[in-house]
Amino acid sequence: MELYFEKELDRLNPYQREAVLDESPACVVNANVGSGKTTVLITKIQYLHHIKKVGYEDMTVLTFTNKAADEIKSRLLAAEPELPADKLRGFGTFHSTALYYLREFLPVEDLGYSKEFLVIDPEEELELAYDLIRQHKLKIKYKNRLKKRLESAMAVREAEKKVSKYQDDIYELAGLLKEEKAKQDKMTFFDLLENANFLLKEAEQKSVSPKWVIIDEVQDSDTQQLVFTDRLISRGASLFAVGDPNQVIYSWRGSAFQIFYTLKHKYQAKELTLPINYRSSTSILEAARCFLQNGSPLTGVREPGSKIIVRRQYDAFQDACYLAARMKKLHEEGISYGEMAVFYRLQSQSKIFEDVFLREGIPFEVSLKKTVGDVPVLKWCIRLLRFSLNTKDTASGIYVLSSREYGEGISGKKAEEIVRAGQPGKSLLFDRMCGLVENCRELGNEEELFTYFELDRYLNPVSASFHEDSDAVRRLFGIMYAYVREQQAERASGMREFVNSSSLYGSDVLREDISRQEDRVKLMTIHASKGLEFSCVFITGVNHGLIPLRTGDMEGEEEERRLFFVGITRAKDHLELSYYMNPQERADPGESRYIRMIPPRLLEHDEDIGPAVSLQELKRQVQEQRRSMTAGCLEQSPGQSLEQNPEQSLEQNPEQSLEQNPEQSLEQNPEQSLEQNPEQSLEQSPEQSPEQAKQQKLVRHSRYGTGVVVNEDETMLEAEFEGYGKKEFIKAFSELEYI
DNA sequence: ACAAATAGCGTTTTT
DNA sequence: CGCTATTTGT
């Protein structure tokens, strides 16, 4: 083993080797993009184990995502296949490690919990809070923002909790919620760390005392995670942390300020640097250097490579069409689609690319954050299992019975009665849930479980999404059975563990079918691109107002710059930036100043925004296609609410009016059509062509009188009434009369 | 019951 | 800044 390890060490560059061999009790490694950070981290772990004879069980390796933790574990196992998995129990995300400590070593009873406590998602905590408000008749203002208000209330110190800003009972609620969670044996992600931190301060030394704390992507730590680290270090652990201050893009969700500085001072940590980037061509690196905050060195070792292409486009649609053609060409040249990626600033920007790529036959995959909670049927099923496995969880029982979409659709009051009384015979579904643990032995696979709950009946067979729903549920059950088998646990307790483990929230329950075909173009936000790399990267919409997004303060501005830095450093060989002359969203037309910050000699401008006569026709077809699609599956997609924004903005954009008069628009360059019709932009309703504005449509309403139609589509109608102003109506329900 | 006043977003997302 | 949801005032 030691010999094998010598070879590993030889493969490292001097900087990497120094980090691995460093002997100081605390060391932070300032690792540049693409400098082999993960390799150093893994080699360090192996070094500690094989050479320094530190047991894996004496190491705590902390990451922020399950994905990162899985990668580290699987790379260790690949090098050492006979390594028993339970030696790596201390390897995982901050939250899963806190969970492990709480379950195995820390006296959670001191906080009123049992060892079998449950992990709940934020939404369930919110439900609990609303329940408490009702039960205790608390006065809470701005209930719609309760989640945010509670978050800030929980962060306030005990001493300052006298009167709330709005003079309501928010602090009382926070206190009650804490009690209630302990009573119901439930912890949120926040509680996992908070409680672990509290107990680590008090508990006896021997219970948890790793010899090493090793942290990946340490720049993303928030205060809670910093405290967790500190608790372990003050128990005698040495520290080895790796991260990149130039890749801080999550400070808005609380990553602590200037971590490297803090760690260096707090623990007299030695700071080492990994300056050499192996990933990108030197042109790309040179451009990236313009966006570094501090003058940290960033050295490349590769050839200059091709210039960065900057494209001027009329709008996102034209860009999408260009990209489709460009990618086809690259594919013909032998670059696989999997090596290409399109980045944008906002989730809502993906839609137009999806539509065009679908039409053009480009295989693609959109990276969307989806958890079980985002799919209504799975959310319902999890609650079904939760109550079945723990009938004390009455909130889940009530939720399942009173759901409108699934189950028996019992009213909330009645459901509460049944669940609280706990008497059988009132509801078949309720009886089945209560009987699950008893009958568990006979239910050997997902199909039998499905049948046991009579889900054929309860998953709302008349709904359009029934097939999709039952497939999703079967898949979830399948994953659960696989988990139980893998853990070699007794069935009921294995299921309980699955349903309550944070691993559930991190697992790819929904992505099974996507990963089959790998050769796809990836579409994602720049945020989501962190940690990935592609041969060809296309960053789209590099306009001011998008990249950078209009931000209030300096800090936000700097974060935007780091974000762009992250985006361009994902590219290995080829990078293209595009900006729009007619951005439909909040962006300004023209190139972002970020493009101007790159030395011109690195750039190649492509300013031809040719008229492409058929483009308008194509665009019309794409929009038509989308309309028929969204009409068909309105209720199935959980992401629907997110996707409504681009839809709306599309209705308002000028193309809508072009679509209504195709003959007129076709021979015009789209850019001209806007500039040549100044009256149009002065109109109150730009979606109407001048002709339509002249022959105004009038409607009569029983209450508001006669009004002028200002906006109209298939479902909605907006009219302006004299003395009343504008009013929106749903056509199907309003009693409107055309005049 | 309606109108005026006020608060606080806006985007990015993991556990 | 401009919009929306909510609270507060009449």
Residue ranges and their predicted role:
Residues 92-100, 214-217, 242, 346, ...:
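Conserved helicase core region in the C-terminal RecA-like lobe
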Residues 2-4, 224-312:
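Conserved RecA-like helicase ATPase core segment
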Residues 543-634, 692-725:
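C-terminal accessory regions
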Residues 1-110, 286-289:
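P-loop NTPase Walker
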Residues 1-35, 39-40, 58-60, 109-110, ...:
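Accessory N-terminal region flanking or inserted into the helicase ATPase core
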Residues 33-41, 45, 105, 269-270, ...:
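Helicase P-loop NTPase motor core
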Residues 266, 306-307, 335-450, 460, ...:
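ATPase/helicase motor core of nucleic-acid motors
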Residues 421-528, 549, 604-607:
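Accessory C-terminal helicase-associated subdomains
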